[in-house]
Amino acid sequence: MKCKNWPIGVCSWSLRTDIRGVADAMKRIGIDTVHLGVRAALGAGGNDFLTAVQNQNWTISATMIDFPQEDYTTLDSIKVTGGVGPDKYWEQNQELFLGAADVTVKLGVKYLSMHAGFIDESDVSYSEIFYERIVSLADAAGEKDIMLLLETGQETAEELRNFLEELDHPAIGVNFDPANMILYDKGNPIEAVRVLAPWVKHIHVKDANRTTQPGTWGTEVPWGNGQVQSEAFLKTLGEIGFDGTLAIEREAGDDRFGDVKLAAERLSSVG
């Protein structure tokens, strides 16, 4: 299934089920491309997980690693717990990332995505350590001939672009999530994707409405029902020359399967 020339995929974690359940949902929707969460491959039962994945006739557009300490309850909680920023969990998270990189290579996938954490240039000591950690992970990815994709989220597009320009690393790109720009209240996603265009390798298809109370989360809604301006966003992707995958992500709502199916139908109907 495609939207124009872009493959349509789904984020495996959106379906909140095991590999067999993901496969069944994808078959019912009519898609064969997946953005695959791989933390389950790194613990007990990891080999069974990988075997189940390898038994599927999937195109894996990217893998994803998340970290156990991440707390998305509030904007403040994710600011201090997200990604590779917290010192207490750095060694554990570094090990998880390296394991995920090995899995990515084993599966023959080019991209490994993650939320890097909070980029805070105002705190020099934190910023230096954060920078060094990202460089070390990108170096490890590059040595394995894969690319680390940083997901948009807690910073404006300009802040992320400045960070990427400072890194100037060939093994770093961006997984652009337009809804996150709205959920975190960090700017207009259409303007943001233009700013980050040179780095954008992979897209999350997700929609949201901005909060009316500063300092609180926006509200995620089904694709096409929110403030991303889905048609204009897709048009912009064409204008910047994006040639990757559109991976549907749904992290809220009572009918995730139905919402993912709706998003796939809306995407595939775009001429």
Predicted segments with their positions:
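Active-site beta-loop-alpha junctions enriched in small/polar residues
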Residues: 11-15, 37-41, 65-68, 117-119, ...
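Histidine-acidic metal/acid-base catalytic patches
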Residues: 1-8, 15-32, 54-57, 135, ...
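Glycine-rich, proline-tolerant flexible connector loops at the mouths of alpha/beta enzymes
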Residues: 35-54, 116-122
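Glycine/Thr-rich phosphate-binding loops of Rossmann-like dinucleotide-binding domains
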Residues: 44, 73, 122, 213, ...
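Active-site acidic/histidine proton-transfer and metal-coordination neighborhood
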Residues: 18-21, 72-173
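Short, structured active-site "lid" loops
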Residues: 58-62
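Flexible, glycine- and charge-enriched loops at secondary-structure boundaries
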Residues: 46, 83-90, 123-127, 186-189, ...
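Short, flexible, mixed-charge acidic loops at enzyme active sites
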Residues: 68-80, 211-217
